[in-house]
């Protein structure tokens, strides 16, 4: 397929976006943002209601996707229109001490934040009875409907792509009076389930017990040790026997030591190294080194350059797990106080565990799935007001692999995408107050 013709609508959207910005209204000052257009909730000044602050928001965006189902042949493209609304409710911010020269911010004894949107809901609660102890409780629900397989490959059946994820967590936090030392221990329960019956074999729950200890030294540096134990169970074992891929209950451990801080006024980094292991009821186990290096340079207050490397081992529906080695770079610019532009690029070298079907036969033409995944994008946002923004993004995503699935028949596979390329473009307007 020729991707040049697919890219034309994306370039047209980007050109229109840039042209509009050049003749835009007088700007409002843009706040700092991360590396990418976040089309989720954004917070403005809010409406005060007693001790609570209400933050409503609404976003309208249109986009083009050259490969909706991430297929390697006979791609399906589409224009997409999305309307998203949300409402956040929060207690007021931290209170400042009126006495002393430090004027440090002190958290309120009770802090609350909650929100509800079309595909996202959250509740965050913190109880701070003293400066040295806190209790934090939170629950987050996310729902995605992004297609991950072509319904025409399953006997023409139409079904929902809805994937629901809920995470409930509790943390106990203790710290020294000087706040040099801080320790955390907690528990979380994650539940992941699909709408469609054909994907019910992938439903699972994960119990986690995280713990961490941080030591702050110098004004802007910290050493952090973290440990996590996770136990994952698939809730429909009988359906796994009839599914196309082998899924296994497992226990996972990971431990790491990292440094985070600013070395100079312009240069900062996060560096860490650790160990991860996974023990599965069936097929491959894993153990190995995990690492992270994230460098950040700000040659000017309006320019931020980031580059880094990640080595991680993550759960996967194929082969139990995937070992990932990823390189990435981002650049963010603020122009005229209101226009934010950014670039992002990444490449990841991934390898799965032994990819098997439930009957023990190979899932594909090779024992292990190996991929090179590439991503790139250009994005921007223009603030007309402190609560009104125009945003746009053009992106590229690709997966290169020699792995091919064998003998799947009509059985639908979770996330089968392999050997694809996709261009997409988005343009939208959002109000957040």
Locate the predicted segments by residue.
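Residue-level detector of alpha-helical transmembrane segments in integral membrane proteins
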Residues: 2, 19-20, 49
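N-terminal secretory signal peptides that target proteins for export/translocation
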Residues: 1-10
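Boundary at the C-terminal end of the N-terminal hydrophobic targeting segment
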Residues: 24-34
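Bacterial N-terminal signal peptides
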Residues: 12-26
């Amino acid at each position: 397929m020729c991707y040049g013709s697919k890219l034309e609508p994306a370039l047209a959207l980007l050109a229109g976006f840039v042209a509009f910005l050049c003749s835009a209204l007088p700007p409002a000052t843009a706040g700092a943002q991360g590396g990418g257009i976040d089309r989720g909730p954004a917070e403005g000044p809010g409406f005060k209601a007693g001790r609570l602050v209400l933050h409503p928001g609404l976003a309208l965006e249109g986009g083009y996707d050259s490969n909706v189902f991430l297929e390697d042949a006979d791609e399906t493209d589409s224009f997409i229109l999305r309307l998203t609304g949300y409402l956040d409710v929060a207690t007021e911010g931290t209170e400042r001490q009126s006495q002393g020269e430090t004027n440090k911010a002190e958290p309120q004894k009770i802090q609350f934040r909650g929100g509800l949107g079309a595909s996202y809901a959250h509740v965050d609660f913190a109880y701070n009875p003293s400066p040295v102890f806190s209790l934090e409780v939170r629950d987050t629900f996310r729902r995605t409907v992004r297609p991950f397989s072509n319904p025409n490959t399953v006997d023409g059946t139409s079904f929902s792509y809805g994937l629901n994820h809920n995470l409930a967590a509790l943390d106990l936090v203790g710290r020294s009076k000087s706040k040099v030392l801080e320790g955390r221990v907690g528990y979380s329960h994650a539940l992941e389930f699909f709408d469609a019956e054909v994907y019910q074999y992938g439903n699972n729950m994960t119990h986690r017990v995280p713990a961490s200890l941080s030591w702050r030294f110098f004004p802007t540096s910290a050493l952090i040790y973290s440990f996590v134990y996770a136990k994952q169970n698939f809730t429909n074992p009988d359906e796994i026997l009839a599914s196309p891929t082998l899924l296994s209950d497992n226990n996972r451990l990971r431990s790491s030591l990292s440094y985070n801080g600013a070395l100079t006024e312009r240069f900062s980094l996060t560096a860490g190294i650790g160990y991860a292991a996974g023990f599965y009821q069936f097929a491959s186990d894993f153990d190995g080194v995990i690492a992270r290096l994230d460098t950040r340079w700000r040659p000017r207050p309006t320019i931020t350059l980031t580059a880094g490397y990640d080595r991680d081992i993550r759960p996967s529906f194929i082969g139990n797990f995937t070992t990932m080695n990823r390189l990435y770079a981002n650049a963010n610019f603020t122009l005229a106080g209101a226009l934010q532009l950014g670039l992002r690029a990444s490449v990841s070298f991934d390898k799965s565990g032994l990819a098997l079907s439930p009957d023990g036969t190979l899932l594909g033409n090779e024992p292990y799935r190996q991929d090179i995944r590439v991503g790139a994008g250009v994005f921007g946002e223009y603030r007309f007001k402190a609560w009104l923004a125009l945003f746009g993004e053009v992106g590229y995503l690709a997966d290169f692999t020699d792995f091919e699935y064998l003998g799947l028949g009509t059985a639908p596979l979770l996330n089968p995408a392999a050997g694809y390329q996709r261009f997409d473009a988005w343009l939208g307007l959002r109000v957040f107050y």
